[in-house]
Amino acid sequence: MKHIRNFSIIAHIDHGKSTLSDRLIQVCGGLSEREMAAQVLDSMDIERERGITIKAQSVTLDYKAKDGETYQLNFIDTPGHVDFSYEVSRSLAACEGALLVVDAGQGVEAQTLANCYTAIEMELEVVPILNKIDLPAAEPERVAEEIEEIVGIDAMEATRCSAKTGIGVDDVLENIVTAIPPPEGDPEAPLQALIIDSWFDNYLGVVSLVRIKNGKLKKNDKIKVMSTDQVWGVDRLGIFTPKQIDTTELNTGEVGWVVCGIKDILGAPVGDTLTLAKGGSTERLPGFQKVKPQVYAGLFPVSSDDYENFRDALGKLSLNDASLFYEPESSAALGFGFRCGFLGMLHMEIIQERLEREYDLDLITTAPTVVYEVVKTDKTVLYVDSPAKLPAINDLEEIREPIARCNILVPSDYLGNVITLCVEKRGVQVDMVYHGNQVAVTYDLPMAEVVLDFFDRLKSTSRGYASLDYNFQRYEASNMVRVDVLLNGETVDALAIITHKDIAQSRGRLLVEKMKEFIPRQMFDIAIQAAIGNHIIARSTVKQLRKNVIAKCYGGDISRKKKLLKKQKEGKKRMKQIGNVELPQEAFLAILHVGKD
């Protein structure tokens, strides 16, 4: 056991985490030259394309150290994006140490910091590494000081390497062996294994990545999943060297994969504990929580024939993604579809892109909303994730909106812009600390503002230097209203949005102006109105197309012209009564972009 090292890599997006892991695999000979692909561990196309890591992955490498001993290195790859922070904390719980990889050109960023604090709270050994020292812009001394100031760990001895060219990678491996402690655990104790991640394989069912904390796991053991109390037989188990290799047992401290015929990913939730069915442990490992979606949106297939395929596609995606929530929803305007819950906007974009790309579907998305806590007049509390479910105004006591605690790291030159942005988004400042040239600002912002476009706006006001980390804090009573959109006096349910009363008027006006551009002109006037309850707050009109009916009268009598105009007017009136308006898909997208311009 003392020759095992479990570690993960903490790094901000694009600081070279996946490239470094490629190098480690190459040096330890996990894959032959021919099998090396760039970013071996990012197995989904979309992960490679966007250059981000979404799912946690693991690799077991054998490394012959300079002291002549052979060490088993278990490396668990973690996602870096803020939407996937729960997966990060699960990956860290399985390790004894973490490599803090920082780009020697850019310095420390907020998500790195957030994950690093998580690691320190879990009492992991944090080993700083300065990457990309081959770049002309690299300033390792300055960045080392920054790490010491902001994170507070000793970085003067930090290993310098360049994952791309391979300089210093051997030093990194030596550092892992010397600085990170071996796993603790009792091989004789009852089995306790932490599920780091689960995914669905078409042939094997659910494959779980586990870390054995105590005891050992053998083939054909009967095991129990502690949160569901279901018992399964272990069919196969083994390790990844990135390739799946079968073994007969996993010992204390090791990380490997287990297949036990579970059909549904909810049967092996991430962060849960496995133990033996007979004589197993009674206590589960700490830190398990059910992942709650933060953002909801309605997804509808463009043609209703696709509904069945869409349902199957969602089912297949949710096998692999336990944090995706969906339930059927129908809308008068859009037909049948699903209300889906996501961790954040990035997660939503990724799911939508995967549905369109892998399952060939055309989808319409309604405006994303967060979950509101609603107190009705009879004191019952509801959780509302869609504007359509909001009770009528006279039944409402109050609406509480979710508040997110946002930690922003920004160079002091851009502090003013960032504060202006936070105030505009109804933020309340909690804290501000200067670290050298960087400022750490903490704000409480409404979740609805954060998920809409806060991240994009933050990046643009700070020229891309600010970084953000947020998590849900609490519900707070707020003056929220539902803005409905009416076309010719009829409500279109799919276009409603929930917004704050102070900005409802301007949002409403923006919305109707935006929609006016997208609705094609008809033979009659179309009134687009935004309303709160029965109170109209904004209106614009798409003008009718009309034929010049008096063109054929040569200078004729005025009464003749009046007669023709009156006849046209009556015809238009009749059309307006029976005519209905087709909404193009662009009109729905207009709503999504209303806050962004």
Swiss-Prot record:
It catalyses: GTP + H2O = GDP + phosphate + H(+). Its main location: membrane. The keyword Oxidoreductase does not apply. Disulfide bonds: none annotated. Its EC number is 3.6.5.n1. It is a peripheral membrane protein. PROSITE patterns: G_TR_1 (PS00301), G_TR_2 (PS51722). Gene3D superfamilies: 3.30.70.240, Elongation factor 4, C-terminal domain, Elongation Factor G (Translational Gtpase), domain 3, P-loop containing nucleotide triphosphate hydrolases, Translation factors. Keywords: Cell inner membrane, Cell membrane, GTP-binding, Hydrolase, Membrane, Nucleotide-binding, Protein biosynthesis. It is an enzyme of class 3 (hydrolase). GO terms for molecular function: GTP binding; GTPase activity; guanosine tetraphosphate binding; ribosome binding; translation elongation factor activity. It is found in: Cell inner membrane. Residues 2-184 form the tr-type G domain. GTP binds at D14, H15, G16, K17, S18, T19, N131, K132, I133, D134. PANTHER family: TRANSLATION FACTOR GUF1 HOMOLOG, CHLOROPLASTIC (PTHR43512:SF4), TRANSLATION FACTOR GUF1-RELATED (PTHR43512). NCBIfam families: lepA, small_GTP. HAMAP family: LepA (MF_00071). Required for accurate and efficient protein synthesis under certain stress conditions. May act as a fidelity factor of the translation reaction, by catalyzing a one-codon backward translocation of tRNAs on improperly translocated ribosomes. Back-translocation proceeds from a post-translocation (POST) complex to a pre-translocation (PRE) complex, thus giving elongation factor G a second chance to translocate the tRNAs correctly. Binds to ribosomes in a GTP-dependent manner. This is Elongation factor 4. It comes from Vibrio atlanticus (strain LGP32) (Vibrio splendidus (strain Mel32)). The gene is lepA.
